[in-house]
Design a protein with these regions (language model features):
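Cysteine endopeptidase catalytic domains of the caspase/legumain-like
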Residues: 23-274
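Extracellular adhesion/carbohydrate-binding repeat motifs centered on closely spaced tryptophans
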Residues: 1-22
Length: 274
């Protein structure tokens, strides 16, 4: 059998050169820049619960940290990763129309190119779940010229907020995570904002959590809503198919559009298990 990951039934295994099956260690880093009302700490709370409800080797909650602190934490958590491992990175924050990810509490951002380059230093597969405006830029999904007006519920000047961030001289382009190393869920298309509701949290994060079996509103475990065939496996495609119509519907209630996006399409890679 060839080296690498192989699906056997509903499970994914990693085979080394010797042909022996190896254990897949999973670890998660939960990030959030929650200094403004539009990015609620409840997002971080929900995804921390999601990961802690799984049999992961390590889950690290790390919100409201500087860019340098985040980079150091990535090194600490992911440096021991093997090729057989799966690493999860969740980010909730503001995002710019140019694809910048405003995750640093010190006013520093990551470009998609910079984030992808950092993660490529480490062995293993990366599952990236990004809940921010224009997040689909990192996988080049959506309408690039779509302009979405700021909604009154945000109650702050988002462009002025983002103007305070600096990405330095790092080059940026679309589709930085279109790479076999990554499995990616984005809260919106590259031409759209990502919305949150008071008392609910961010729309995409809410349904990603519920899809895996955690209700962030009731703060309790539930049956995994994305497990449509009840086999106890939540694949990337299942979570995408579950969250996409619900986020779109909820956004329409505030007269906006928000399309969850995914890479790669139709992936049967198992992200979570019951």
């Amino acid at each position: 059998m060839k080296t690498g990951r192989h699906n056997i039934g509903d499970d994914t295994y990693f085979f080394a050169t010797s042909g022996e099956r190896q254990t897949i260690n999973r670890r998660a880093l939960v990030l959030g820049e929650t200094s403004t009302r539009a990015v609620p700490i409840e997002d971080v709370n929900a995804m921390e619960k999601v990961f802690n409800n799984q049999d992961f080797s390590e889950v690290v909650r790390f919100p409201d940290k500087t860019k340098s602190e985040i980079i150091a934490k990535m090194e600490e958590l992911f440096k021991s990763s093997n090729e057989s491992d799966v690493n999860y990175l969740y980010l909730t924050c503001h995002g710019g129309e140019d694809g910048t990810i405003a995750i640093g509490s010190d006013g520093q951002t990551f470009s998609g190119w910079e984030l992808a380059s950092l993660l490529k230093q480490y062995k293993g597969k990366f599952v990236v779940m990004l809940d921010c405006c224009y997040s689909g830029t990192i996988i080049d999904v959506g309408k690039p010229d779509k302009k979405v007006a700021s909604k009154s519920e945000e109650r702050f000047d988002e462009q002025a907020f983002l103007a305070g961030f600096s990405t330095g001289d790092v080059a940026s382009k679309n589709g930085e995570m279109l790479d076999s190393k990554f499995l990616v869920l984005c809260a919106s298309w590259k031409g759209e904002k990502s919305y949150s509701l008071v008392g609910v949290g961010s729309l995409a994060t809410r349904y990603w959590a519920m899809g895996t079996g955690w209700d962030p509103l009731q703060n309790r475990m539930i049956s995994p809503m994305a497990d449509t065939n009840t086999n106890g496996k939540i694949t990337l495609e299942k979570l995408y198919q579950y969250s996409y119509p619900l986020v779109l519907e909820d956004a329409s209630q505030i007269h906006e559009e928000q399309h969850v996006s995914v890479y790669p399409k139709n992936s049967q890679f198992v992200l979570f298990q019951k």
